[in-house]
């Protein structure tokens, strides 16, 4: 770790879900898996005893019994939307407790794998000891993560090339790779392709020596998911006191998140203090194509 003590992270008080019909809070839940789900179910106003009696119990238990192999075998061919329909949650409960997390995967529910959704719900609700109120970075990621990571990697002997485009791969001498770039080529024993879908498809398409036809077909079949919109606003006045730093939304059109950055990190806080304004970011996930 670049920061073994994780000193750039700070806890948040809550991750509220804001809707036109009422809000949901995740503050005060126990961190113990399953007990947190039980307490949330007990205290939410969107689920009553009669509602719980109508819930599809086997489908709901799939969230609590996540097993990578078994879950993907059973649910990977089911869409997230179909799975959420099968749960038979009341509309308000689905909107506040499930829709926000499903949508934050940046995939439309009609296209997303139910197994992927279950994996995410498992992590948030039953596998994460921090529960649903998470830590946030108290400074920009550039200062908190990427610059320190670069310094550490260079200290360990790694080379970092900024602003260099990888164009293609070629295998030479049996077990050596040459990475063709827009500058000088690089040689390596192993190469990891970690880029966005259009980038990896372009590199693989231009590469020689990648003779696994099935793998090439899998790469060619990759699709780019729907767009994720971010609108950062530098306001000339402060937002209302008590606003959460990070809040999910549901039932308000395409808006999925409102972040008040001076409540999260030091750079925005300094700007807000200096100007008397506020730094607000609005997110919209999985926008229609």
Residue positions per predicted region:
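Amphipathic alpha-helical segments that form well-ordered structural scaffolds
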Residues: 1, 79, 83, 101, ...
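Feature captures the FAD/FMN-dependent oxidoreductase FAD-binding
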Residues: 2-28, 153-160, 167-177
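Mobile amphipathic helical/loop "lid" adjacent to a hydrophobic cofactor/ligand pocket
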Residues: 5-118
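Secondary-structure transition/turn motif
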Residues: 21, 29-30, 180-185, 283-287
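Active-site rim elements
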Residues: 67-71, 132-138, 217-220, 289
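Helical element adjacent to the flavin cofactor pocket in flavoenzyme catalytic cores
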Residues: 120-182, 186, 190
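Conserved FAD/dinucleotide-binding core of flavoprotein oxidoreductases
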Residues: 127-139, 197-202, 270-289
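Mid-domain catalytic core of redox enzymes
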Residues: 162-280
């Amino acid at each position: 770790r670049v920061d073994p003590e994780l000193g750039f992270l700070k806890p948040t008080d809550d991750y509220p879900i804001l809707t036109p019909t009422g809000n949901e809070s995740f503050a005060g839940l126990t961190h113990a898996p399953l007990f947190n789900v039980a307490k949330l179910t007990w205290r939410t106003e969107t689920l009553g005893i009669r509602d719980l009696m109508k819930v599809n119990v086997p489908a709901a238990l799939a969230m609590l019994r996540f097993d990578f192999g078994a879950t993907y075998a059973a649910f990977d061919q089911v869409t997230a939307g179909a799975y959420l329909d099968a749960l038979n949650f009341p509309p308000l409960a689905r909107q506040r407790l499930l829709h926000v997390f499903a949508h934050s995967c940046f995939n439309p529910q009609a296209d997303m794998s139910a197994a992927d959704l279950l994996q995410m719900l498992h992590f948030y609700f039953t596998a994460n000891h921090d529960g649903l109120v998470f830590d946030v970075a108290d400074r920009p990621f550039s200062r908190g993560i990427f610059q320190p990571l670069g310094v550490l990697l260079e200290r360990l002997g790694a080379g970092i090339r900024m602003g260099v485009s990888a164009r293609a791969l070629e295998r030479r001498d049996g077990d050596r790779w040459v990475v063709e770039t827009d500058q000088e080529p690089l040689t390596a024993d192993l190469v990891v392709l970690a880029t966005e879908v259009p980038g990896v498809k372009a590199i693989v398409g231009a590469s020689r020596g990648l003779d696994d036809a099935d793998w090439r077909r899998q790469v060619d079949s990759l699709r780019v998911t729907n767009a994720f919109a971010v609108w950062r606003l530098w306001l000339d006045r402060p937002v209302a006191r008590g606003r959460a730093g990070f809040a999910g939304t549901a039932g308000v059109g395409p808006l999925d998140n409102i972040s008040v950055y001076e409540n999260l990190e030091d750079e925005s806080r300094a700007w807000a203090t200096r100007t008397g304004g506020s730094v607000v970011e609005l997110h919209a996930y999985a926008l229609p194509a």
